Amino acid sequence: MERKIFKTTIGGRELVIETGAYCGQANGSCIVRCGDTVVMVNATMAKAPREGMDYFPLGVDYEEKMYAVGKIPGGFKKREGRASDKAILTSRLIDRPIRPLFPKGLYNDVTVIATVLSVDVNISPEVLGMIGSSVALSISDIPFAGPTGSVVVGYVDGEYVINPDLEQRAKSKLHLNLAGTKDAIMMVEAGANIISEKEMLDAILFGHEEIKKIVAFIESIQAEVGKPKAEVELEKIPEDIDAAVRAYANEKMDAVLENFDRSAREVAEDALDEDVLAHFADDFNDVAKKTKFILDSLYYLKKEKVRAKIVNDGVRPDGRALTEIRPIWCEVGMLPRVHGSAVFTRGQTQAMSTCTLGTISEVQKLEGLDEDYYKRYMHQYNMPGYSTGEAKPLKSPGRREIGHGALAERSLEPVLPSEEEFPYAIRTVSEILSSNGSTSQASVCGSTLALMDAGVPIKAPVAGVAMGLIKDTESGKVAVLTDIQGLEDFLGDMDFKVAGTTEGITAIQMDIKIKGIDEAILTRALEQARQGRLHILSKMMEVIDAPRADLSKWAPKIVSFAVDPDKLGDIIGKGGKTINKIIEETGVKIDISEDGTVFIASNDSAAIKKARTIIENIVRDVEIGDIYEGKVVKIMENDKGQFGASVNFAPGKDGMIHISKLSKERVEKVTDVVNVGDTVLVKVIKIDEKHRVDLMLKEVIKRA
């Protein structure tokens, strides 16, 4: 292929797409450049469908290469290993807007791989990977109903910004990843510092205008270098099987769906499946996938009926109204040794969340293409098989678990106290005990309760709710559902999660299964979500309405204070000798930041106080009149006898008490008053030109 270079301007920066020079055997390939950030994206498709598939096997990977920022990977092998959480989350961002645009029944494996080749810190590679995936698929012969466009929207000083740079990202109240076609929004992923529904909607609409330009740009590339789309085999239910199954099962399915109880409905569904399979046992035996086609036909029949009842009658599978939230109950403080604990239950969805407080040294260090940084708040999400009644072995977290954990983390970050206000590392873990939809938002609610139970002084409680959408393509009727359950998520067109406080939004995530939703639906969904969020918050506040005044007795007590950064070496000492001695003597844990912040942690308040006094004595300048607690380290004597005692009153700081300053009375021998090892209280009475310190004894605190 001939090398082609295409250019446009996005968000005030030149965007360059290059095709034809590299990766000639991929179905579609491109290089995306913006400034010094370069991402290569390749799309490939298997020649034949994968046998036994009942879902579209799309694989998306976003690869972070350390050479892109001039680094050699750590570890023994010195090569990239398992994908970072950030890479996994970016893979999900790429996947979600493109997945609905492949034809139904396509079971050929399709892979999209975005490889980061070079990074300018002011230009994030993630959005280039999203744009590149659309380009690679659009110019390939892979069936794809794109293109899509993608942007990041920031909100800085009251102005919306497309693809903000490093400085703008630091100031922004919003980080919004947005993808869509020229007609509609396909994917929304955002974290926000408590902004209103209107501000969020305006940001989405602002970003969509830029997306339209990107889509037009990709369409022009496709027109010039795109391949004709391949004719692929799409699996389809044979018309005679579908007609026969529907005729036999139509009324029976109505009876099944009259069960508002999930368990009873599932039992009835299983019985109907067996009934229909038995009824057609002697029919269609010449069809290779007869059983699969019969069950697929039943599935689509159920889907149509559930959707029709919702859109036309306003009746949901469990009998709720469209805006009705399932019954909620909560409890806190169930686990006695855990720093904070809570259970949040909404219908058949239940999350148990815990909060653990640690020292600043326990923050999570993240290495990647960005500058290494430390994450003080961590939220982790686990969903074992028993939560859905399945016998599945435990395994390490997958992409879904990592994505749900990140969403809850993003939801809660804006309300956490600063490190200066609350010098702790904070970890919340959500264990999903029972699942029937909206588990990620249950984990947001449960974690809020656990944080308050732990005594973390959050700015405001946060709750989350998942919204759903059913859109009838023929009539155009739309139903927006509050607090969707599993069946509504599975059979619906949208899963739109919104988390926030009473004042505004902290996070949203939208997954869409149809070809986009418009402004009117977004407006309606956001307002309905706000009402639902306020209802959920009111239920949570009935259990605990403010953070506890005191931390758990099992949580470490931490104090922080600032010292002169130039004196950190005095605290640490040669080879760590001084700080290790303080730790050994007091039993505390000490962390020191380069900016001069000292953190002291212990379950013993007296030990913290003692360690702080020692450190403050080390760093403060000795002045006449200062009083110190010290230890007698040597009895001073000459040929005339004892004349004083040397006292160490701070690490690296010694002074002498002359025999005349041991008492108001005459003292014959120093050892009549003090001995080596005695703990004494002394006062500085003189500092000479050589910085030698003279002391006066105030009292003997403890004899050796």
Short names for language-model regions:
Residues 1-46, 233-370, 556-570, 578, ...:
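Extended amphipathic alpha-helical scaffolds
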Residues 141-260, 451-549:
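Mobile "lid/hinge" segments at catalytic clefts and subdomain interfaces of large enzymes
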Residues 1-233:
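Long, basic N-terminal domains or extensions that often function
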Residues 14, 26-111, 116-123, 189, ...:
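Glycine-rich, flexible beta-strand/loop modules in the N-terminal catalytic cores of phosphate-handling
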Residues 228, 232-239, 535-561, 609-629:
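Long, charged amphipathic helices and adjacent flexible linkers at domain junctions
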Residues 556, 565-704:
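Single-stranded RNA-binding regions, centering on S1/OB-family and related RNA-binding modules
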Residues 104-110, 145-147, 214-232, 263-264, ...:
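Flexible, glycine/charged-enriched surface loops at secondary-structure junctions
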Residues 28-30, 123-141, 332-355, 436-456, ...:
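Conserved phosphate/anionic-ligand binding catalytic regions in large, soluble enzymes, centered on
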